[in-house]
Swiss-Prot record:
Keywords: Disulfide bond, Hypotensive agent, Secreted, Toxin, Vasoactive, Vasodilator. Pfam families: ANP (PF00212). It comes from Notechis scutatus scutatus (Mainland tiger snake). This is Natriuretic peptide NsNP-a. Expressed by the venom gland. One of its GO terms (molecular function) is hormone activity.
Amino acid sequence: SGSEVAKIGDGCFGLPLDRIGSASGMGCRSVPKPTPGGS
């Protein structure tokens, strides 16, 4: 499911990935795919 979350980018924080983003602070940037969506 991580792949799907990375694609959304915006959902990175809304989805379970938030746990990694909150701890690392860059869960969305962790994957090169969300680069265009994160911007």
